[in-house]
C-alpha cells in the first residue's frame, strides 16, 4: 500500500545549475538525510536535508566592493525542505505551515566576510547571479530568499574564531547590514567586559535595532543526523549534467569585464550597461 517519495527533479536541476553558476564541484552521488530536532516549526520533528553527500561543494562568488575585487568561498549549496514560519505576538507564538515541505536551496559560505558592508555587497552579488541564472526571482518580500547570519569574533592576533552566534528574522539585505553593525560591537563589548559569548540563536528586531536571544544553538551531533530511509541516493548520468550545464549563463561581473575589454568601456559605463541588462532580464522573468 502506498509508494515511497521521490526527490523533486526540478529542484535537483536548479540546485545543480546553481552549483555551476557558483563554480562548485558537483558530485555524482547525492544522498538525503534526516535532521532530527524538536521545535514547533517542524511538526514531524525532522527535516529532510543533505549532510554527508550534498548536491554541490567548494565554490565561490566573485564581486566588487568600492572598485576592489572580492571573493567569498562557498562551502556548499544543498537541497532541503522548508519548515514552517514562526510568528511571535505578545506572550504567544504561532506557526504557519503553508511553506512546509517546499524544496529549499541553502547556500552556505565560508567565514570570509569581514564587515557588514562586505556582507551586503556579497548578498547583492549572489542575488544577481541567482536572478540572471533564472534560479529564482529572489523577492524577499515574497519569501523567495532569506538570510541567516553567523557572527564570530576573535581577539586581535588570534586565528581562532569564538563562539558562533546565529541571527534570524532579517527581512532585507539592508537589515542584514544593520544587524551586523549592531551585533559585532555587542560581542566585542561583552568580551572587553570579561563576559563569555555563548553559541546561540538570536532574533533581529528591526524596529528596535537590536538582537534578542531566542535559544541556545545546537551542534551538528545534537541533531542526530542519519540517512533518510525513504529516499534512495541520486546518481545522475553524464548526459543529465551536460543538459543542466546548457543553462549556464554569463555572470554579471564577467559580462561587465567583457564589455570593458570588447568595447573599451570605462568601469562605470560597463557596470551601468550590465545592470541595465540585468534589470531587463529580471522583467522578462517576472
Residue ranges and their predicted role:
Residues 250-273:
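Long, charged low-complexity interaction segments
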Residues 276-282:
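Conserved small/polar residues in nucleotide/adenosyl-binding loops
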Amino acid at each position: 500500500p502506498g509508494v515511497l517519495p521521490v526527490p523533486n527533479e526540478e529542484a535537483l536541476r536548479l540546485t545543480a545549475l546553481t552549483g555551476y553558476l557558483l563554480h562548485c564541484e558537483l558530485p555524482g552521488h547525492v544522498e538525503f538525510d534526516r535532521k532530527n530536532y524538536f521545535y514547533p516549526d517542524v511538526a514531524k520533528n525532522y527535516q529532510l536535508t543533505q549532510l554527508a553527500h550534498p548536491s554541490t561543494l567548494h565554490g565561490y562568488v566573485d564581486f566588487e566592493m568600492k572598485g576592489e575585487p572580492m571573493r567569498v568561498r562557498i562551502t556548499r549549496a544543498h537541497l532541503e525542505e522548508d519548515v514552517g514560519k514562526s510568528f511571535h505576538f505578545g506572550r504567544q507564538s504561532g506557526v504557519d505551515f503553508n511553506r512546509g515541505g517546499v524544496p529549499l536551496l541553502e547556500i552556505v559560505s565560508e567565514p570570509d566576510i569581514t564587515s557588514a558592508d562586505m556582507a551586503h555587497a556579497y548578498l547583492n552579488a549572489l542575488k544577481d547571479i541567482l536572478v540572471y541564472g533564472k534560479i529564482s526571482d529572489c523577492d524577499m518580500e515574497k519569501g523567495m530568499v532569506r538570510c541567516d547570519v553567523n557572527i564570530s569574533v576573535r581577539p586581535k592576533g588570534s586565528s581562532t574564531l569564538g563562539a558562533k552566534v546565529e541571527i534570524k528574522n532579517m527581512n532585507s539585505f539592508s537589515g542584514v547590514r544593520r544587524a551586523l553593525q549592531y551585533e559585532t560591537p555587542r560581542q566585542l563589548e561583552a568580551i572587553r567586559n570579561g563576559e563569555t559569548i555563548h553559541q546561540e540563536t538570536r532574533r533581529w528586531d528591526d524596529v528596535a535595532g537590536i538582537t534578542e536571544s531566542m535559544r541556545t544553538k545546537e551542534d551538528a551531533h545534537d541533531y542526530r543526523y542519519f540517512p533518510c530511509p525513504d529516499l534512495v541516493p541520486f546518481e545522475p548520468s553524464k548526459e543529465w549534467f551536460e543538459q543542466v550545464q546548457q543553462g549556464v549563463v554569463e555572470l554579471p561581473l564577467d559580462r561587465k569585464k567583457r564589455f570593458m575589454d570588447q568595447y573599451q568601456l570605462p568601469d562605470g559605463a560597463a557596470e551601468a550597461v550590465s545592470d541595465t541588462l540585468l534589470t531587463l532580464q529580471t522583467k522578462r522573468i517576472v
